[in-house]
Amino acid sequence: MKNKQTPYKSLISGHRTSSKFDSTIYFREVELVDTSPVERFISQRELLTRILGREDDSDEWRTKANLVIIGIVSGVESYFRSIIRRVLISDDDSRAHSYKNKVSYGAVLFHLSHLLPEALLEDCTFVSKETILKNVNNFLGLSINPQQIPALDAALDEFERVCHLRHCIAHRSGLLGSKNAIELGLDKFSTYLEKPISPTLDSVNNVFNICQNLVLEFNDQIFDRIIIRSIPKGIWTGDLRKDKKTFTPLFSIFSPTPNDRDELRKSYRSFTDHFGI
């Protein structure tokens, strides 16, 4: 045997193509359409539905189904980031509550001012009941007890189950792992351990509905609590002509039809009539 040998390399895996990550080819400078976070979520659901198309019994369709499940959960996370950012820009109480939160030096240097609040959320996730409630409280000063709001509590529980499904797709190539099976209910799901997720069109639509229900429930809760929190300030007159400057920005943040003037008037009147303003 020779004293000096070149390192053994079998190349058992076969031929490979040399490739280097070039970040410049993945992004474009585009101007996003200014719309409300809930409207953007609904539009994303519609887009994902079109991408999924008609159900068929093929690996290709099931792969698309898995990918749109990841996409809709991502849409929920994007909703929370966007709504928190928009509220921090517009609502004085929320902004004051977030003064103590930290943002990276790089974000301060390079973020546009209207996007800077979103940099606060870089280390946050919105894939469980605990983290969603914690982040809404930490950044907006809204302490929400879901046990007092059955519809919201149910929406959070269902979404958390969807997130376990998403975890299997994103991190285990669509196979059900033991940890996720335990969270979903091991007695019920033990027979599916290490077996592939096989979604149907109905099951994907069920995931879409669960995600949308959570977004709509939270959208209502955050709007209601912010506007109720403002009442003691005595800023509302009961006359939309006088209150439009304050009410319109809030309506535009939370409404799925932010440019609908009839809905604006209806929402304002519902608020003032309820509180006798």
Predicted regions and their residues:
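Polyanionic, low-complexity intrinsically disordered segments
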Residues: 1-31, 36, 175-277
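Charged alpha-helical initiation segments
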Residues: 1-74, 78-85
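Generic alpha-helical secondary structure signal
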Residues: 39, 153, 157, 202-205
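Charged, amphipathic alpha-helical oligomerization/scaffolding segments
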Residues: 47, 71, 161-168, 206, ...
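Helix-loop junctions and short alpha-helical segments
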Residues: 55-165
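A generic secondary-structure signal for well-formed alpha-helical elements
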Residues: 76-83, 87, 91, 173, ...
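Histidine-centered, metal-coordinating catalytic motifs and their short helical/loop contexts
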Residues: 155-183
